[in-house]
């Protein structure tokens, strides 16, 4: 049985004892139409007028986190551990086995957005879960071994370290300057322009100043909102779909494998990001991160300490802008 264990030196949590199993039968894609029996029952489906699904969500075949598990928090001397309570869902993004995100129509992307938002809102009702995040891996170098386009939804009893770090640093900035850190970053990036890949009325796509991967790009709202799931205005949703699809058409010309993450505010902020003086909605700012995985870092291997990349964000932004979208 898998469980969560806390590293006392870094305060990070790891899942131990997890053994993923291969999905489906030999030669069959479990996510393709007609193979629904190879997956758990659907939690939610969007269906067309013909009665066929075109977006489908179900519990992961080999979940990292499980709803039926108890928290069961325990201490072993100096060490802390707990059950891997949570949820792990798969969203099959469309019926096509070979369609990549750069090929999506705007309407297909909007339906996918709707499913993301529905599942985040639903899972956040469970008070055991402190964070619900959505991510997508494409390509084996990104850790995906089923080619059929799909995303993951993870609801966890602890806030992931990257989200926790963002919450802590955005709160610190807000307390010092009474402004949102990402709002300030967006304003500076637009003024300078050198790392901007594309821009529309409501969003900007940038290669971040301290990129961890070659051609890493973020899509950030030009307005302040902590919660991706709050995005309901249809004009704004169309702008998000347009800039994401434009960016993915550029990135897929340069990278065969990538991860997409939607960073939305946690339900319960980490301790250092919480206080009566300021609410997380004031300082956290949701955004999407696209992390290409094709490229090797230099010989320095302490990837948990420093990321070393071969191209500057400014060069990456120029290269992405040169790609046809």
Predicted features, each with a name:
Residues 1-148, 154-226, 235, 249-251, ...:
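Active-site microenvironments that recognize anionic phosphate/pyrophosphate groups
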Residues 244, 248:
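An acidic, glycine-/histidine-flanked metal-binding catalytic module
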Residues 115, 242-243:
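Short, glycine/acidic-rich beta->alpha junctions
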Residues 229, 233-242:
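Gly/Ser/Thr-rich active-site loops/lids in small-molecule metabolic enzymes
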